[in-house]
């Protein structure tokens, strides 16, 4: 067999098998996605098929840009590096600029409005604490589990269980005290809502800059936070347009667990206030 000399004392067989390229490794995943897209298009609806592609796009944006909501706040607190939080501010600003006009002019789109409540404050604190411990929010846990990270693969079923249990007891939590939901678009119109949102984001950016000592600057930010924000804003807007509701992850986790509990005969959704609602 002929050999090729690559360096003194080192040779490689000319016919040696090369390591598969990244594209070759991704080909089976692409084939599965394409097959699932075709099945949804044929058996379910074009809407669900398109939402599959939107979900793939969101997952790709999160993984390729390593765009983490949990990570952004952690590096701000631990290292006083505001890049991740600034990336999230860019994402929210872009998405607000696209989604608020849609919510105002397309009646088939609906905002995810919930009542400000004691349960919201308690839940936000517990969720924020746990996502730092688990190294991921809902979307982060899902895409890291998809990448094969053992920690997140173990957390995923527990996340689903927790979401399900929270939905089952939702009415009891709301009974602790809640106000009426407030929709900025309904209250101020698309323009007023957008201006209010951008102003609030600007205040957050200023406060973060003062605390970290690094003012907001696109030139100083790592590129992945910028283009990741653009990609996620694009696909989140497409999700709103196609699904008629905002991008949400945690509801899906609870739905998986609810379906599993129902299939095992452990839960009757018709006897629960949340799951018996036609919207759920």
What kind of feature is each model-predicted range?
Residues 1-280:
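Membrane-interfacial helix-loop segments of redox and metal-homeostasis proteins
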């Amino acid at each position: 067999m002929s050999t090729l000399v690559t360096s003194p004392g080192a040779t490689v067989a000319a016919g040696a098998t090369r390591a598969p390229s990244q594209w070759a490794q991704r080909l089976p995943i692409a084939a599965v996605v394409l097959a699932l897209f075709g099945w949804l298009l044929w058996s379910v609806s074009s809407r669900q098929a398109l939402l599959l592609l939107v979900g793939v796009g969101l997952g790709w944006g999160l993984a390729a840009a390593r765009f983490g909501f949990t990570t952004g706040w952690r590096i701000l607190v631990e290292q006083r590096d505001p890049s991740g939080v600034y990336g999230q501010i860019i994402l929210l600003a872009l998405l607000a600029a696209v989604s608020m006009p849609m919510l105002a002019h397309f009646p088939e789109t609906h905002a995810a409005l919930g009542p400000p409540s004691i349960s919201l404050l308690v839940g936000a604190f517990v969720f924020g604490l746990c996502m730092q411990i688990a190294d991921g929010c809902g979307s982060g846990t899902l895409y890291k589990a998809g990448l094969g990270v053992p920690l997140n693969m173990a957390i995923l079923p527990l996340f689903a269980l927790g979401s399900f249990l929270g939905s089952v007891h939702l009415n009891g939590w709301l009974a602790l005290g809640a106000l009426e939901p407030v929709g900025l678009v309904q209250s101020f119109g698309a323009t007023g809502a957008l201006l209010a949102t951008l102003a609030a984001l600007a205040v957050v950016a200023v406060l973060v800059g003062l605390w970290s000592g690094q003012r907001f600057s696109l030139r100083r930010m790592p590129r992945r936070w910028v283009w990741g924000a653009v990609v996620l804003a694009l696909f989140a807007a497409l999700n709103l347009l196609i699904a008629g509701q905002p991008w949400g992850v945690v509801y899906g986790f609870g739905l998986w667990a609810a379906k599993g509990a129902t299939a095992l005969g452990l839960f009757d959704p018709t006897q629960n206030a949340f799951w018996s609602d036609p919207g759920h």
